[in-house]
Every structure is written in C-alpha cells, then in structure tokens.
Amino acid sequence: VDVPPLCNFILPAIVRTGPLAVAISTAGASPALAKRMKREIAELFGEPYANLAVILNEVRGWAKATLPTYQDRRQFFESIVGGDPDPIELLRTGRVAAVRELIEDAMRAYAPVA
C-alpha cells in the first residue's frame, strides 16, 4: 500500500544504460517530478556515456598495471574524458575508432619511459 505517512523508505527512480546507473529521488515529495527527471536524464546521458564507460573499462587493467599511483591513473582517465576532441561527441556521431585512437594516444603519453 502506498501510504507515505506509513512508509519508512523511498525507492528512487533509476536510469540504467549499460554499466551506468543514475538514481533520482525527490525524497517522496513528487514522484511525477522524479519520473520527468528520469526521462530527461536518460535522454541527456544515454548511449554515448554508456559506451564510453565500456571502452574506458577495457583499459582499466592496463592503467592499474602500468600507472603506479592513483594520481597517475586519475590524470590519465581525466585526460581522456575531458579530452579534445570530446569523446562523448565522437560517440554521438558514431566515431568509435576515433575514441579508441584518443585513448591509444593517452596510453602512449602516460606510459612510463622504459
């Protein structure tokens, strides 16, 4: 029974796309608003973001094995995510190979010199 005064928990609206999940809550104030926000967030952060998450996950092992510190790994991934060209825009236009090239360039730039 949905009787807010008798409830002691609230379920968020959740947007799931690939490995991404975004939870939205209005603390029970407005399920209709949460539904609208869920729809808008799904449109804004859809497939390109999920695809980038999958691609970045593919290089996590390399980063952990190659880059010695958390700071090094953070800089590496931030250089890709905030890179120029923007990987999200590349994915929105179907240019997956260009994103992979961007990542390969970052791997070469951040790999320790042997």
Put a short name on every predicted segment.
Residues V1-T26, L33:
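Rossmann-fold NAD(P)-binding glycine/threonine-rich loop
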Residues G28-A114:
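An accessory alpha-helical subdomain
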